């Protein structure tokens, strides 16, 4: 009896009160459960009798989905179409639609009936789906410089609403200008799911600079974020504008080496066959861009060219220089000369460039070659001449030997440091090295020989006065010289006599110096009296003495 009363109250409320007319919107995800709130999920009214969900069918007529009595736990599903197995009601009276699809994009109405009121809340459902990642397909194999070509097609699938596609080059958006860039977009819908696929075709006029450009396609959708395709690069075809010839062999090029010439063109794809002009002779090479000269000589120096097979005017030129160095030295090897003779050294050189010449003597660098017009013993040695240009060096040499008859230049004596011995020194010049013979026995202290100069020393203890001779010999001749050597006693007496003589000579020199000074003084004094005309004061005897002294001859 109570439920009947409630039902009658509901009908009265439905007749008295007008339902609300405001329509809200809810976004559902494709394939997910769509939640449609009733009155934005607010608290249920007091005296609730039941809640009913209904919808607008495709033909515009209303259709019932379910009713939930306030006193019952379960709702009664009244739908007979596809919603029968997909709809349910939540505890807050929200409508739950399982496995949402684009067919659910319609208006759903929640009717709330209580003892005091009847309200209807309409909600429009929209179903969104994020598109698949964008993919560039049907790519062009290559692009031609200056020619409008379809670069590729960008595709995204299964989206709602449809995605927008944007083409970019090096992250810069490409804009359709109707001439050099043309972008054509189309949208297709799946007949079953209703989902949209978007495709965009790009026609692009490439330039040479695009050889390293990267093209991408960006998909923009309300579900965000933006999705970007994998970057694509394309070979750019363009004709040759410049030919270049390179000498790839290591510089400098020397006689006997191989020289490789390489011809390159800036076209793409690059030409693979060329004409080489080898000093006026045309040589065609196919399927390669190099030509090799084997075992070059100085005669191969000259102008070389290369050009395209179909265009001889477009060519490149290189001058090839083969480096060479010819050197002749006179004399070479071992050279034997006598001291005082003349030696003429001549160096002849022929080179592809200015040659640098350096001389060394016995491994020591010389500023210049010595003057050999009058050879000395010090001129002997190994002379090496290095002549070089870049990459080439020649070394020639001669070993000069200067010979001469021995000649003694000095024979001296002095006491040893302890004063008990006499040291005789005999110095001589000659080559080969002279041998020495002394006329007395003694101790040979040292022998040195350098640059044709020999030094011999002999230590003796003479017991009497001696005459010592030094004899030097080599294969060319000999020389001898003598020196007197006194015993220690005689030498001491001689030294004392020398001291006495020195003292006497010193006294005589001092006396002469005093007399000279006195004479100069008297002479100056007399000249002073004549000049003044005055008579000197004094006796007549003093005047006579002065007069006599003036007439005496100087001693």
From Swiss-Prot:
Residue intervals of the Ig-like V-type domain: 23-127, 131-229
Glycosylation sites: 92, 171, 350, 441, 465
GO cellular component: axon; dendrite; plasma membrane
Keywords (A to Z) from UniProt: Adaptive immunity, Cell adhesion, Cell membrane, Cell projection, Developmental protein, Disulfide bond, Glycoprotein, Immunity, Immunoglobulin domain, Membrane, Repeat, Signal, Transmembrane, Transmembrane helix
GO biological process, one term: adaptive immune response
Tissue specificity field: Present on all retinal ganglion cells (RGCS) and their axons (in embryo). Absent from mature axons along most of their length, but is present on new and growing axons derived from the RGCS at the retinal margin. Remains on adult RGCS only at cell-cell contact sites and is continuously found in the retinal axon terminal arbor layers of the adult tectum.
SMART domains: IG (SM00409), IGc2 (SM00408), IGv (SM00406)
Basic and acidic residues: bias regions: 532-555
Cited function: Cell adhesion molecule that mediates both heterotypic cell-cell contacts via its interaction with CD6, as well as homotypic cell-cell contacts. Promotes T-cell activation and proliferation via its interactions with CD6. Contributes to the formation and maturation of the immunological synapse via its interactions with CD6. Mediates homotypic interactions with cells that express ALCAM. Mediates attachment of dendritic cells onto endothelial cells via homotypic interaction. Inhibits endothelial cell migration and promotes endothelial tube formation via homotypic interactions.
Designated name of the protein: CD166 antigen homolog
Source organism (scientific name): Carassius auratus (Goldfish)
Taxon lineage: Eukaryota, Metazoa, Chordata, Craniata, Vertebrata
Gene name as annotated: alcam
């Amino acid at each position: 009896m109570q439920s009947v009363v409630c039902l009658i109250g509901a009908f009265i409320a439905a007749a008295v009160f007008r339902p609300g007319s405001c329509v809200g919107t809810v976004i559902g995800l494709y394939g997910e459960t769509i939640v449609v709130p009733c009155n934005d999920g607010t608290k249920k009214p007091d005296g609730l009798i039941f809640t009913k969900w209904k919808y607008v069918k495709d033909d515009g007529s209303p259709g019932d989905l379910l009713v939930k009595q306030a006193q019952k736990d379960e709702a009664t599903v009244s739908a007979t179409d596809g919603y029968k197995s997909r709809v349910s009601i939540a505890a807050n009276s929200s409508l739950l639609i399982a496995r949402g699809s684009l067919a659910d994009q319609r208006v759903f109405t929640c009717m709330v009936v209580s003892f005091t009121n009847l309200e209807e809340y309409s909600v429009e459902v929209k179903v969104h789906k994020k598109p698949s990642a964008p993919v560039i397909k049907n790519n062009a194999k290559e692009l031609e410089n200056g020619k409008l070509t379809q670069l590729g097609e960008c595709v995204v699938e299964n989206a709602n609403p449809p995605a927008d596609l944007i083409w970019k080059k090096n992250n810069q958006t490409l804009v359709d200008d109707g001439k050099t860039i043309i972008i054509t977009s189309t949208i297709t819908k799946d007949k079953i799911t209703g989902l949209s696929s978007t495709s965009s075709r790009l026609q692009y006029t490439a330039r040479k600079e695009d050889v390293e450009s990267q093209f991408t396609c960006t998909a923009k959708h309300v579900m965000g974020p933006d999705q970007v395709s994998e970057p694509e690069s394309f070979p750019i075809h363009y004709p040759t504008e410049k030919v270049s010839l390179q000498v790839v062999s290591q510089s400098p090029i020397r006689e006997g080496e191989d020289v490789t010439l390489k011809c390159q063109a800036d076209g793409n794809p690059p030409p693979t066959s060329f004409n080489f002009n080898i000093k006026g002779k045309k040589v065609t090479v196919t399927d390669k861009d190099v030509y090799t000269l084997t075992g070059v000589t100085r005669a191969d120096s000259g102008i070389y060219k290369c050009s395209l097979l179909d265009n001889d005017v477009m060519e490149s030129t290189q001058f090839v220089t083969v480096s060479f160095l010819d050197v002749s030295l006179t004399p070479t090897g071992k050279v034997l000369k006598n001291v005082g003779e003349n030696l003429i050294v001549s160096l002849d050189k022929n080179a592809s460039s200015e040659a640098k010449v350096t001389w060394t003597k016995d491994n020591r660098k010389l500023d210049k070659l010595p003057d050999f017009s009058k050879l000395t013993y010090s001129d002997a040695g190994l002379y090496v001449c290095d002549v070089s240009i870049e990459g080439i060096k020649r070394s020639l040499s001669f070993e000069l030997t200067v010979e001469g008859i021995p000649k003694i230049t000095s024979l001296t004596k002095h006491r040893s440091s302890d004063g008990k011995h006499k040291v005789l020194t005999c110095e001589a010049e000659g080559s080969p090295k002279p041998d020495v013979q002394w006329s007395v026995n003694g101790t040979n202290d040292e022998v040195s020989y350098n640059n044709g100069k020999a030094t011999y020393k002999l230590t003796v203890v003479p017991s009497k006065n001696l005459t010592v001779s030094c004899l030097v010999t080599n294969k060319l001749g000999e020389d001898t010289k003598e020196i007197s050597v006194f015993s220690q006693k005689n030498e001491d007496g001689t030294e004392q006599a020398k001291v006495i003589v020195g003292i006497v000579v010193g006294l005589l020199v001092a006396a002469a110096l005093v007399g000279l000074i006195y004479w100069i003084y008297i002479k100056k004094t007399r000249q002073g009296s004549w000049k003044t005309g005055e008579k000197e004061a004094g006796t007549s005897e003093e005047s006579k003495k002065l007069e006599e002294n003036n007439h005496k001859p100087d001693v």
